[in-house]
A protein has these predicted regions:
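Short beta-rich binding modules
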Residues: 1-238
Length: 238
C-alpha cells in the first residue's frame, strides 16, 4: 500500500506546526525526548478516513499512544477553510507529516508501509490478538522530542440510537501531542529552512509548563458541543 494519497498539494502552505496552541498514565505538559516504537495505518470502518497509530516510549519507561487522523472521510488530507475559501491541510496530517520529517527527513508520502503482525486489542474478543497491520518501519525506532499538553475533557459514550460517541457529564485527564521536534530541538519547518539557532521550542516550553492544562470542557459547555482535537477548527473527518 503506497502512501500516494498523502502527497502534499501545490498551493497549500504548511502552517500548523509552528503555532503555540491553546496511555494509561497522565504526564504534565512539556517537551519530552521519545522513541517511536510503533507507527501503523488504521482504516476507518465507516468511511475512507485513515489514521496513523503511534506508540512512543518516554522517559521513565512510560508509553504514550496517539491515533492521528491524516485524511477525512473522503480520503483527502486537506479541507477548504470556510472563512478564506482556501484549502488547508488537516491538522492531523500536518502533525503526522512533521513526525515523519523530524525523524527521517522524508515527507510522509515518501514512506513505504510494510506488512507486520502485532498484538492489538480486539473489541469482539475483548483481549489483545495478533493483527496484520501496515507498519511505517522508516519511523520505528527513531527518536524525536514530543511537545505534549495535559487536557481535561468530557468522557464519551456511544449513543445507542445514533451509533455515534457523545459527551457525558464525566470528565477525564489525558495527553495530546501538539508539536514535534527533531532531537536537536528544531521543528520540521525550521529543519527545512536549515535554521541554525533554536527558537520555537524555547517559546513552546515557556507556554507549556508543567502547570499548563487545556480545559476543553469550558469551551464545550459554552458552545454546547465538543471541541475538535488539537485546538484547530476543522470539518468532520467522517
Amino acid at each position: 500500500m503506497a502512501l500516494d494519497f498523502l502527497q502534499k498539494k501545490a498551493g497549500i502552505g504548511e502552517t500548523t506546526q509552528d503555532k503555540i496552541g491553546g496511555g494509561s498514565f497522565i504526564i504534565n505538559s512539556g517537551a519530552y525526548p521519545a522513541k517511536v516504537t510503533k507507527a501503523y495505518l488504521q482504516q476507518s470502518n465507516s468511511s475512507s478516513a485513515v489514521a496513523i497509530v503511534f506508540e512512543f516510549k518516554l522517559p521513565d519507561d512510560k508509553t504514550l499512544n496517539e491515533t492521528i487522523w491524516v485524511t477525512n472521510g473522503k480520503g483527502e488530507n486537506f479541507y477548504v477553510d470556510q472563512k478564506s475559501g482556501k484549502p488547508a491541510y488537516l491538522p492531523g496530517f500536518e502533525l503526522a507529516s512533521n513526525i515523519a520529517y523530524v525523524t527521517t527527513g522524508k515527507e510522509l508520502a515518501a514512506l513505504t508501509p510494510e506488512d507486520k503482525v502485532i498484538e492489538i486489542y480486539n473489541s469482539e474478543l475483548k483481549k489483545k490478538a495478533p493483527t496484520p497491520v501496515k507498519m511505517l518501519m522508516d519511523i520505528v525506532d527513531t527518536e524525536l522530542i514530543v511537545g505534549i499538553q495535559k487536557v481535561v475533557e468530557f468522557k464519551q459514550a456511544k449513543n445507542q440510537a445514533t451509533g455515534k460517541y457523545e459527551d457525558t457529564a464525566e470528565t477525564r485527564e489525558t495527553n495530546e501531542i501538539v508539536n514535534v521536534f527533531n532531537i536537536a530541538g528544531f521543528t520540521a519547518l525550521e529543519a527545512k529552512s536549515e535554521a541554525k539557532e533554536l527558537d520555537f521550542i524555547i517559546k513552546f516550553k515557556e507556554v507549556y509548563t508543567a502547570e499548563f492544562v487545556r480545559d476543553k470542557t469550558k469551551k464545550a459547555k459554552a458552545a454546547g458541543t465538543t471541541t475538535p482535537n488539537q485546538g484547530v477548527t476543522t470539518p468532520s473527518l467522517f
